[in-house]
């Protein structure tokens, strides 16, 4: 009985993956809000201007960006809203 209980606890911890996933918004500025569970543990919000105006892109991880693009990376759920 103890072995079964211990097995269930271990499986629960592995499945929940404490601290290694993050819920991030993952849409562009013109789209309705959507979220994604990210394995990388970080969210980003990228902002730039072009002929359409200000563009905002959201997603997982923290990508490298070209000059002229602002990026904000964060590590809590839905922090890139």
UniProtKB/Swiss-Prot annotation:
CDD domains: TFP_snake_toxin (cd00206). It is found in: Secreted. GO terms for cellular component: extracellular region. The keyword Secreted applies. InterPro entries: Snake_3FTx, Snake_toxin-like_sf, Snake_toxin_con_site, Toxin_cobra-type. Expressed by the venom gland. Disulfide bonds join 24-43, 38-60, 62-73, 74-79. Residues 1-21 form the signal peptide. Keywords: Acetylcholine receptor inhibiting toxin, Disulfide bond, Neurotoxin, Postsynaptic neurotoxin, Secreted, Signal, Toxin. Gene3D superfamilies: CD59 (2.10.60.10). Belongs to the three-finger toxin family. Short-chain subfamily. Type I alpha-neurotoxin sub-subfamily. This is Three-finger toxin A1. It comes from Micrurus laticollaris (Balsas coral snake). The lineage of its organism: Eukaryota, Metazoa, Chordata, Craniata, Vertebrata.
